[in-house]
């Protein structure tokens, strides 16, 4: 099968992407690591000894960043619909976060541990219809925020990816109620054409 011009252009962009090259040289599984690194460097959410939950973790680059930041005394729990090659120090659950039994398994693994930081890089299966994909993204963001509301300790942090569009401001305003500060960030590693932004909640107010 011949490659299309679009696929050739994507491959060329991927090969020449400085973040892809850095990910390889620094041992990260994907360029997405540098999105979280930039966000955490700016807002200082993760520190040694913390408990972090990483939703939408595959292929594992955000969990790698979290591991490096919380150290041996911390714990990282990761969840994704897709499989994740083993990462030493990461407790992984494979399943759909939208399904109650999967959520129950994650909560069982946590065993009542208060969580310092909830990360969500979850994205919907893309349909190619912008309004549909954006609505699904907001829904996943709502689920992540609900989980954070049940498990974050007071003062905890929250990072969630959502797509801009209809419903974004309503979601942002709802999230802002739960944190002392809420920032909208677009890391340098995010592609310019992408509708994704990250909401960073600092200082969870408690339920």
UniProtKB/Swiss-Prot annotation:
Gene3D superfamilies attached to this UniProt entry: Vaccinia Virus protein VP39
MF terms in GO: rRNA (uridine-2'-O-)-methyltransferase activity
UniProtKB keywords: Cytoplasm, Methyltransferase, rRNA processing, S-adenosyl-L-methionine, Transferase
Residues noted as binding S-adenosyl-L-methionine in the record, renumbered to the chain: 60, 62, 80, 96, 121
The enzyme's E.C. designation: 2.1.1.166
InterPro entries found in the cross-reference section: RNA_methyltr_RlmE, RNA_MeTrfase_FtsJ_dom, rRNA-MeTfrase_E, SAM-dependent_MTases_sf
Record bears the keyword Iron: no
Active site residues of this protein: 161
Main location: cytoplasm
Keyword Methyltransferase: yes
One Gene Ontology cellular component: cytoplasm
Catalytic activity entry: uridine(2552) in 23S rRNA + S-adenosyl-L-methionine = 2'-O-methyluridine(2552) in 23S rRNA + S-adenosyl-L-homocysteine + H(+)
Pfam family, one: FtsJ
Compartments reported by the entry: Cytoplasm
Function: Specifically methylates the uridine in position 2552 of 23S rRNA at the 2'-O position of the ribose in the fully assembled 50S ribosomal subunit.
Family stated for the protein in its record: Belongs to the class I-like SAM-binding methyltransferase superfamily. RNA methyltransferase RlmE family.
HAMAP family, alphabetized: RNA_methyltr_E
Official protein name in the record: Ribosomal RNA large subunit methyltransferase E
Organism: Aromatoleum aromaticum (strain DSM 19018 / LMG 30748 / EbN1)
Source species taxonomy: Bacteria, Pseudomonadati, Pseudomonadota, Betaproteobacteria, Rhodocyclales
């Amino acid at each position: 099968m011949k490659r299309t011009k679009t696929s050739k252009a994507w491959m060329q962009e991927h090969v020449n992407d400085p973040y892809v090259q850095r990910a390889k040289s620094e041992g990260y599984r994907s360029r997405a690591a540098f999105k979280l690194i930039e966000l955490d460097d700016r807002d200082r959410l993760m520190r040694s000894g913390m408990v972090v939950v990483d939703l939408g973790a595959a292929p594992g680059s955000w969990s790698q960043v979290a591991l490096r930041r919380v150290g041996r005394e911390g714990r990282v729990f990761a969840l994704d619909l897709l499989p994740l090659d083993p990462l030493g120090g990461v407790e992984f659950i494979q399943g759909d976060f939208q399904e109650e039994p999967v959520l129950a398994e994650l909560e069982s693994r946590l065993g009542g541990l208060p969580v310092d930081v909830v990360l969500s890089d979850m994205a919907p299966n893309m349909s190619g219809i912008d309004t549909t994909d954006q609505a699904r993204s907001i829904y996943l963001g709502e689920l992540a925020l609900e989980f954070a509301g049940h498990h974050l300790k007071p003062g905890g942090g929250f990072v969630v990816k959502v797509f801009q569009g209809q419903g974004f401001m309503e979601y942002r305003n709802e999230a802002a109620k739960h944190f002392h500060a809420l920032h909208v960030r677009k890391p340098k590693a995010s592609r310019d054409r992408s509708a994704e932004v990250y909401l960073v909640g600092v200082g969870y107010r408690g339920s």
